[in-house]
């Protein structure tokens, strides 16, 4: 399940520095000038999962395979991007191809790092980005209305549904609100996603702070947190510069460095988990002598759907899922203990998988 999160923001806010740290490479050219990221950089990132290590230790498993999520570093946006200013058209197309958006805002003062607007104001940065995305959505939708109306009048049900959703989105956008604020019925969600609206994607606000503010945040990041709450977005505080330094250290040095900063873990771990949560994802595990593995599914997925993530044959020929809750598996030290304690369950097709379930699937094709 290769889901993508776009890392977006104005030039010189720390997007590429953050991306470099996420991928532990210098693939994104982090430079102090606009548009240093011209082609989108895609990084395949492991989702931090302490539970997986504990499960692997019980068996023990030879290999540990975490869940993964993709981050995309795209070119810095400038005012007028919706009209093609800067690298606007390319920027917008790159976002359209992702599942969620992480808005990176600059929450630090540094005279050596220029700001494209001439001053540091994270809320103004958010307004600029959101406005450009809303304008792009408005233009995209308005172009479709006349054709959809014509086709809907012929009795085309699909066009009628799309037209209804287009008008729903236009109502929000014309009121100055992103499309994600619209209330979409469950039966319309697939058609809604097909609109590929930039402002309908789940949003994560990332406050990029200086080293001194990495543990507690600062006045600017507090303002961003308040805006995130108002906008229904998630929020995380991180110091991209610190994270880039941490990424180059070995595990022992990393722990010591974090302690000196008053941190218990890298900020990137929080960012990755927030992105995972933002996409409505959860994890189940398969465990054996060969490997312990985390699998990514959507919240609410049934056992057959979870099996299908491993292989489509597992879903097509699903018979049952042998299931143990994570806490029971660890507390009872594996499958044998869970069986003895009556915590080993046989679940059928209607079972909704819970986060952390340890599963084995029986199927026939």
Model regions and ranges:
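Amphipathic alpha-helical transducer elements in NTP-driven molecular machines
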Residues: 35, 49-52, 65-71, 85-99, ...
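C-terminal-of-GTPase-core extension/linker across diverse P-loop GTPases
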Residues: 2-8, 13, 19, 147-354, ...
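Residue-level signal for pocket-adjacent positions within structured domains
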Residues: 25-33, 40-42, 47-50, 54, ...
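Short capping/connector residues at structural and topological boundaries
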Residues: 6, 35, 40-43, 50-52, ...
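Conserved G1/Walker A P-loop phosphate-binding module
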Residues: 1-114, 142-143, 148
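Conserved Switch II/interswitch segment of TRAFAC-class P-loop GTPases
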Residues: 43-48, 75-85, 96-157, 172-185, ...
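Short, glycine/charged-enriched secondary-structure capping and boundary segments
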Residues: 22, 84-87, 116-119, 218-222, ...
């Amino acid at each position: 399940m290769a889901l993508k999160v776009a890392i977006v923001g104005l030039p010189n806010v720390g997007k590429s520095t953050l991306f470099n740290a996420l991928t532990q490479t210098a693939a994104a050219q982090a430079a102090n000038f606009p548009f240093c990221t011209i082609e989108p950089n895609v990084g395949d990132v492991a989702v931090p999962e302490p539970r997986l290590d504990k499960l692997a230790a019980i068996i023990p498993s030879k290999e540990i395979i975490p869940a993964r999520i993709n981050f995309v570093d795209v070119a810095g946006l400038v005012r007028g991007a919706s009209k093609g200013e800067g690298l606007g058209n390319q920027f917008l197309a790159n976002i359209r191809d992702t599942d969620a958006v992480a808005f990176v805002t600059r929450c630090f003062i540094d005279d050596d790092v220029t700001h494209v607007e001439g001053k540091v104001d994270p809320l103004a940065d958010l307004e600029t980005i959101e406005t450009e995305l809303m304008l792009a959505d408005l233009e995209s939708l308005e172009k479709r209305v006349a054709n959809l109306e014509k086709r809907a009048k012929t009795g085309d049900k699909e066009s009628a549904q799309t037209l209804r959703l287009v008008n729903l989105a236009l109502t929000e956008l014309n009121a100055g609100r992103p499309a994600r604020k619209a209330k979409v019925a469950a039966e319309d969600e697939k058609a809604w996603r097909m609109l590929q609206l930039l402002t309908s994607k789940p949003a994560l606000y990332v406050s990029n702070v200086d080293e001194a503010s990495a543990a507690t945040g600062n006045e600017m990041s507090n303002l961003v947190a308040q805006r995130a709450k108002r906008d229904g977005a998630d929020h995380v505080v991180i110091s991209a510069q610190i994270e880039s330094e941490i990424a180059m250290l070995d595990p022992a040095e990393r722990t010591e460095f974090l302690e000196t900063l008053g941190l218990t873990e890298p900020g990137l771990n929080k960012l990755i988990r927030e992105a995972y949560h933002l996409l409505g994802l959860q994890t189940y595990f398969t465990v054996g002598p060969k490997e312990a593995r985390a699998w990514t599914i959507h919240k609410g997925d049934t056992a057959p759907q979870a099996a299908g993530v491993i292989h489509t044959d597992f879903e097509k020929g699903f018979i049952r899922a042998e299931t143990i809750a994570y806490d029971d598996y660890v507390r009872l030290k594996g499958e044998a203990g869970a069986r003895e304690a009556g915590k080993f369950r046989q679940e059928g097709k209607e079972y909704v998988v819970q986060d952390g379930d340890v599963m084995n699937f029986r199927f026939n094709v």
